[in-house]
């Protein structure tokens, strides 16, 4: 058959409802909003074509390859309940389309081009199924949950953190002082803010030195292992690695990276360096809401979370759930499980479109951070369980007596909640009561409770 020039409907080639997916396929669930007059099958096929082998017209060179082997296929379409003209299009991609061990390449293929397509009014990537064969090409988190607990010698409870505020403007010496006070008071970690890199008021090397000094002083006084997330994010990959090398030379346990603004290539390089040199890696998701906030367009955070587990990170910020809507709680817990567990069953009520097997890829600790304080502690302990980091920035530094008492209040509240839970008490119902009891023998906690009057949780 000779080459037949011209434009034909995508669905003739790329919509294949009879296709049986393979174990090695990467599967994607897209929320598609077609333009008026575009049938859903065509819209689904557009997505499959433009994110794999297709282009707008038939080309002569199609005859030089086996399209059936390499093309993406839209294999199922379902309407979205309660939404007019929205569909979930399921697309299967052959594994050969992707470079091994490259999150960058995976995203460039799947979401690189198709989101600006005229036939679509809006498009959102809701979930990805990463096949075992592809998972195995990634190093993943530098260390993972178990190794981190062993390094820190901390078991049976969530870890406590605090972001140092004001985030910009402190000198390195004053910054280090705040770090020391928080760690001395009982926190496990303190944190550079995501936008603390190396600015005129505080260059990175000075900050690293003063924070390391604070860390060692607090360790000596408390007998506990302490950490400060030193933000190694920089303008170039070379500079980022240089900062990580200096952190390693100081002997600190953990560094930090802003993985979306820094980019997946830089993040994966840093994760490899961290595994090779015994550093834990804390990941901040600055810029995520630009990508994931719109319900009908962009990429859902669960996909960004999966991508981070592949690229590599030991902690990642994942929202707080507290005080949010019920549905959001289930959805958040869905991607928290995707970060921590080895094997996650498909569960649409939690937003999980595919069963995901991570084989032996280490897990990532979810970090709850943003607007939380001591009254939230029972809810956070209940919702996130032991394998999490609870971060109180203002909830530590906003204590009326200062930073160290703020840290004491948080640690006492956490220990009280963990003890109550281990005794079989119901944190959901008795949370406020547990905190009030603990106040009796901790004036620091009592003062914190007074400032942030109790919040009512309807579990």
UniProtKB/Swiss-Prot annotation:
Cellular compartments per GO CC: chloroplast
Cell location: Plastid, Chloroplast
Positions where N6-carboxylysine occurs in the chain: 191
Source superkingdom: Eukaryota
GO molecular function: magnesium ion binding; monooxygenase activity; ribulose-bisphosphate carboxylase activity
Main location: plastid
Cofactor: binding details: Binds 1 Mg(2+) ion per subunit.
More about this protein: The basic functional RuBisCO is composed of a large chain homodimer in a 'head-to-tail' conformation. In form I RuBisCO this homodimer is arranged in a barrel-like tetramer with the small subunits forming a tetrameric 'cap' on each end of the 'barrel'.
Chain's role: RuBisCO catalyzes two reactions: the carboxylation of D-ribulose 1,5-bisphosphate, the primary event in carbon dioxide fixation, as well as the oxidative fragmentation of the pentose substrate in the photorespiration process. Both reactions occur simultaneously and in competition at the same active site.
Entry protein name: Ribulose bisphosphate carboxylase large chain
Organism: Micranthes integrifolia (Wholeleaf saxifrage)
